[in-house]
Every structure is written in C-alpha cells, then in structure tokens.
UniProtKB/Swiss-Prot annotation:
Sequence repeats: 42-148, 149-253
Source species taxonomy: Eukaryota, Viridiplantae, Streptophyta, Embryophyta, Tracheophyta
Organism for this UniProt entry: Oryza sativa subsp. indica (Rice)
Topology of this chain in the membrane: Multi-pass membrane protein
Name of protein: Photosystem II 22 kDa protein 2, chloroplastic
Protein origin, superkingdom: Eukaryota
Listed GO biological process terms: photosynthesis
Amino acid sequence: MALQQSMAMPMMVVSGLGTAPRSSPMVQLQRMKKHLVVVAAFKSRTKASPKVDKSNKNKSIVEDGIFGTSGGIGFTKENELFVGRVAMLGFAASLLGEAVTGKGILAQLNLETGIPIYEAEPLLLFFILFTLLGAIGALGDRGRFVDDATGLERAVIPPGKGFRAALGLSEGGPLFGFTKANELFVGRLAQLGIAFSLIGEIITGKGALAQLNIETGVPINEIEPLLLFNILFFFFAAINPGTGKFVTDDNDDQ
C-alpha cells in the first residue's frame, strides 16, 4: 500500500510539470480588453477630405451676361457701365449739336457722308462695330448686380429731415433712384442709338434728327420739348451715380 502511494506521487508531479495551469475566463477577458485598448490607441487617423474651392462655383454664378466672359475680351460690367456713361454723354451732345447746327455727328467732324457703307473710313467702321458689340454685351460683361440692403430705416421716411425728405425723396444718395443695373441698360440704349445714327448718316448723309424729320438748325429755346427732355435725360443719367454695386469673379465690390 505504501509502495502504491509512493509510485502515485511521482506520477502526480510529472503530470503537474507536463500540463500548464489553465487561466480562468475572467483573466482571458481582461487580456482581450487590454489588447483592444492598445489597438484603439494606435489606430491610424483617417485622411481629411480635400477642401472644395468655392471660387470656381462662384464664377459660374456671377456670369449672367449674354455671352459670358469666355466670348469676350474680359470686360466687366463696371467697365461697360463706364462706356455706357460716355455713350450717353456723346449721344446727348450730338443731338444737341445737330439741333442747333443742323449737322449730324459726322458732318460736325467734317467726315464724308452719303456714301455706301463699305466706302466709309475703316476707323469709323471699327468704332461702329465696337459700339454695337458693347451694346449687346459681346465684349464680355462679367459680374452680377447686387442692390443695396433695404431695411426699416429705408422704408420709413423720418420727419424733419429736409426738403428732399418732405418730397418723399431720400436724403442721401442719387436723386433719380437709379440703380447701376438701370444705368447699364440706358447706356446700352445710348450705344445702340449712336451706332445706328452713324450708319444712317453714312448712307443717307442726314443726322439722327434729320432722319426722323425733326426740325434742326434752330436756337435752343425753340427745340422740340420731347427732344430737349431726351437730351436732358441722357445727360443727367450719365452724371447721376446709381445705387448698388457689381460683384465680379474675384469678389471685388465694384
């Protein structure tokens, strides 16, 4: 019996050395949690999405002209507004000069008239073509109109602000209430008027008023009232600044 016990003890020792003690499920779960925490701590960062350039989107928004910028020579609406103001002054001065002297624009400049259009001076033809293209926006009318902000202080006229406020007009700013968009439209009309009056005078030898059978060569006080009103309208529209502004692709306030 003692011999059997002594033989069993080495067997137990051998079996104890041969097999490693198994860890409990709680210990295995803790090891897994530690492993997960380490992985989360060294997780690679996700790449940030590239920033979208919003300026390219704005370019398509501000091009609201007839031909856009791609079909022109880079004119902005502010440039076209300046050309329109010059055209309004020129058209008003030419009508006033013809009404007083009885001569058209070209006759006042001693240029040959009453000839076919292809025999006209090349520089004159270039000027007519430039004026026509500018009137329809083919030179490039990049930009869009943004009106001034309107609020309660603009809608209600405060009492006791002066003579203009008593008449229902704004104390500051232009008298007509024109915006730059309206002024641009009137400038285009003046450009068209100059171009077609020049074409008619080249062919017929008559000025713009003579083509309409309006009496010319008279003193200023005898000019037709409607004609005088048109002359004054173009003159004041050219020198009267309009409200609002033009915004271009570069987000510059014009």
